[in-house]
Swiss-Prot record:
One of its GO terms (cellular component) is cytosol. Substrate binds at N256, M285, Y314, H350, S370, R371, G372, D411, G412, M413, R414, E450, Y477. Homodimer. Zn(2+) binds at H454, H518. One of its GO terms (molecular function) is carbon-carbon lyase activity. This is Phosphomethylpyrimidine synthase. Its cofactor is [4Fe-4S] cluster. Pathway: Cofactor biosynthesis; thiamine diphosphate biosynthesis. The lineage of its organism: Bacteria, Pseudomonadati, Pseudomonadota, Gammaproteobacteria, Alteromonadales. Keywords: 4Fe-4S, Iron, Iron-sulfur, Lyase, Metal-binding, S-adenosyl-L-methionine, Thiamine biosynthesis, Zinc. InterPro entries: ThiC, ThiC-associated_dom, ThiC/Bza_core_dom, ThiC/BzaA/B. It catalyses: 5-amino-1-(5-phospho-beta-D-ribosyl)imidazole + S-adenosyl-L-methionine = 4-amino-2-methyl-5-(phosphooxymethyl)pyrimidine + CO + 5'-deoxyadenosine + formate + L-methionine + 3 H(+). [4Fe-4S] cluster binds at C598, C601, C606. The keyword Protein biosynthesis does not apply.
């Protein structure tokens, strides 16, 4: 190819890329302009009332259809199925009664609670030099909230000498409204579900976690006070709904969003925020590295019902034009203040990347893969000084506790391939993070620990065990881990497996991985795919740990599946839209919505349908046996039943009947064959049709009796196979 051809092709690709970005931005703008609350199919927003009028905990309940247990089509006998309550991260975005206006931001849910504690002050203006510079730039006005918007708030800070963290309050024995909110939210109203089938569950294995106790406000306070859980809520983010991260609570999932220098816009990031909460993101990290980081973050925070995290070193690096060697503590400190006053709820700080650890990575296959870790490693080597995040860590803590910003101690030495897993550099940093968490606790700063990464399955538990030992049970927050490196494009699978395992062992929050991991910046659909994969992993871990009520949704869906309640199957799932679409690909007819089979096995080989028929056959024999028993009591004689010998009277008769019924329930192969032959005859007698008109339903019920006297049971207008 000539240089001219190469240049032309490059120009064409660039034009196409710009066109695609314009289209994406326009679509995101349209999404924001028309944004209305959106609920999942057949779901309702539910609010549980706390101890005070302004403490209403939002969640979702999935409504179910009735189960038909007999009767005629025109007058069926039904069994009511209860609504299933589920955790909801979407805040007002899933409430049809909410008035959504992205340009006004969300309601300040927690502001009254913050004000009444009387330990904060409203600042006259921001104290960050960078923020003041941005506000003076009129050229950025088009990126800001309009003057007078309710989204604009003046920043708050702790009064001199005060600490305003949830950890500080917990250690004082104070149960805050945030703690009560969390307790109600974690219980999810599952105590109201009394159905025996829905509450079935196996014995969990919690690996030392305190699972099974009622989640009371006092339990939440105690976990926070011990440092085993956090409630990441900046006093400047009153829009956020309280949630907790800790291994004795439900496993949480974080979603990453953020623009870069080459793609995405503010509109797209706000769209991804709303999209993330719809699909279950418990927290969102804004990892923006491109232009307008400050303005993008402002729009995200003011419209976020979930905690927002950042990696401040990314923006600090932008301020020194991307040259790591030019970073200073002063630039970084101003960045912390800027973000804390905006309302960032937790900072990822790579303070454990020490100068002496950098040479430990020299023989790694993939070296240092953490972006923040590599930035600090380069700074340490270029200055041949200790990491300034480590040497200034106490100052970082003093700043964080003034806004209740939680710390997420970053794993800058995490392995980037399974070949590097559990090596010296990784565990050396982990020990340092344990040292730092104890310093943070001296200042009442809520803290979690970040973890790997790429770890083969057999080495995962060692990571959890060492973290608990070195970090005094501070919550663990991991990226996966990815358990194999052979599947680019499918790393939400390879990491989801590891995520489920480490969450079962005790990890408190999982950072999602999308199909674009290692390949590019995720779009909306990638975000959804990553979240669904990780919600599966988190939920599977909750079940394995033995969380009370965690399995209720599974049992409800299984019951719906067995009863061929197709709509309930879709709606009880994590992604109703996809489930419905997959079913309709092969069976699009409306009649298929009530069919007692799917396209996998077809009408003649559905195991669940066959099982139902066998149950009906056994039930008919049981009914006949009971009738004979009653007749025997009246006439003084007992009609023969199978091979059961006739007995004279009373309890002896009933015990023999029970023994025979137990035998029927077990079923020999011959009896199963006979039962299927009978159903085959019934099917043929009805004209071998899969579906019967509604006006023929009664006629079907009156079908001629077969040799054994069993009647055709027609639970629906769909003919039994």
């Amino acid at each position: 190819m000539s240089s001219l051809e190469s240049s032309s092709e490059s120009i064409a690709v660039n034009i196409l890329g710009q066109t695609n970005r314009r289209v994406a931005r326009a679509q995101a703008q349209a999404f924001i302009d028309t944004l209305k609350p959106l609920q999942h199919p057949n779901s309702q927003k539910l609010y549980l009332q706390g101890s005070r009028a302004d403490l209403r905990v939002g969640m979702r309940q999935i409504l179910q259809t009735d189960t038909r247990i007999g009767g005629r089509a025109a007058a069926p006998n039904v069994e009511k199925n209860p609504p299933i309550p589920v955790y909801d991260c979407a805040g007002p975005y899933s409430d049809p009664a909410a008035q959504i206006n992205v340009r006004q931001g969300l309601a300040k849910l927690r502001l009254p609670w913050i004000i009444e504690r009387q330990d904060t002050e409203v600042l006259d203006c921001t104290t960050s030099d960078f923020t003041q510079q941005r506000l003076k730039d009129d050229g950025l006005d088009h990126l800001r909230f309009e003057a007078g918007s309710s989204a604009i708030i003046r920043p708050r800070r702790a009064l001199p000498g005060k600490r305003v963290s949830q950890l500080h309050y917990a250690r004082q024995g104070i149960i805050t409204p945030e703690m009560e909110y969390v307790a109600i939210r974690e219980n999810m109203a599952l105590a109201d579900v009394q159905d025996e089938i829905l509450n079935r569950r196996g014995q969990g294995e919690s690996f030392g976690a305190v699972i099974g106790k009622p989640i009371t406000p006092e339990f939440v306070r105690d976990e926070i006070a011990r440092g085993r859980a956090i409630i990441p809520l900046n006093i400047n983010h009153p829009e956020a709904e309280p949630m907790t991260i800790g291994r004795n609570f439900l496993v949480k999932v974080n979603a990453n969003i953020g623009n870069s220098a080459v793609t995405s816009s503010i509109e797209e990031e706000v769209e991804k925020l709303v999209w993330s909460t719809r699909w279950g993101a418990d927290t969102v990290m804004d990892l923006s590295t491109g232009r307008y980081i400050h303005e993008t973050r402002e729009w995200i925070i003011r419209n976020s019902p979930v905690p927002i995290g950042t990696v401040p070193i990314y923006q600090a690096l932008e301020k020194v034009n991307g040259v790591a060697e030019h970073l200073t503590w002063e630039v970084f400190r101003d960045t912390l203040i800027e973000q804390a006053e905006q309302g960032v709820d937790y900072f990822t700080i790579h303070a454990g990347v020490l100068l002496r650890y950098v040479p430990m990575t020299a023989k790694r296959v993939t070296g240092i893969v953490s972006r923040g870790g590599s930035i600090m490693a380069k700074w340490c080597l270029s200055h041949h000084q200790e990491n300034f995040l480590y040497t200034h860590f106490r100052e970082i803590c003093e700043l964080c506790v003034a806004y209740d910003v939680s710390l997420s101690l970053g794993d800058g030495m995490r392995p980037g391939s399974i070949a590097d897993a559990n090596d010296e550099a990784q565990f050396a940093e982990l020990e340092t993070l344990g040292e730092l968490v104890n310093i943070a606790w001296e200042y009442d700063v809520q803290t979690i620990i970040e973890g790997p990464g790429h770890i083969p399955m057999q080495l995962i538990k060692e990571n959890m065990d060492k973290q608990l030992i070195h970090c005094a049970e501070a919550p663990f927050y991991t990226l996966g881990p990815q358990i194999t490196d052979i599947a680019p494009g499918y790393d939400h699978f390879t990491s989801g497996i590891g995520a489920a395992m480490i969450a079962w062992y005790g990890c408190a929050m999982l950072c999602y991985v999308t199909p674009k991991e290692h390949l590019g910046l995720p779009n909306k659909q990638d975000v959804k795919q990553g979240l669904i994969a990780y919600k599966i992993a988190a939920h599977a871990a909750d079940i394995a740990k033995g969380h009370p009520g965690a399995q209720i949704r599974d049992n409800a869906l299984s019951k719906a599946r067995f009863e061929f309640r197709w709509e309930d199957q879709y709606n009880l799932g994590l992604d109703p839209d996809t489930a419905r679409a997959y079913h309709d690909e092969s069976l699009p007819q409306e009649s298929a919505k009530v069919a007692h089979f799917c396209s996998m096995c077809g009408p003649k080989f559905c195991s669940m349908k066959i099982t139902q028929d066998v149950r009906d056959y056994a039930a008919s024999l049981e009914a006949d046996a009971k009738a004979q028993s009653l007749a025997a009591e009246t006439d003084g004689a007992l009609a023969p039943l199978g091979s059961v010998q006739q007995v004279k009277s009373g309890h002896s008769e009933l015990s023999h009947i029970d023994a025979e019924l137990n035998y029927i329930a077990v079923k020999t192969q011959d009896e199963l064959t006979a039962a299927m032959a009978q159903k085959s005859a019934e099917f043929a007698a009805l004209g071998a049709k899969l579906y019967l008109p509604l006006d023929n339903a009664n006629a079907a019920n009156e079908l001629a009796k077969h040799k054994d006297g069993a009647k055709l049971q027609s639970k629906t207008q769909v003919a039994k196979v």
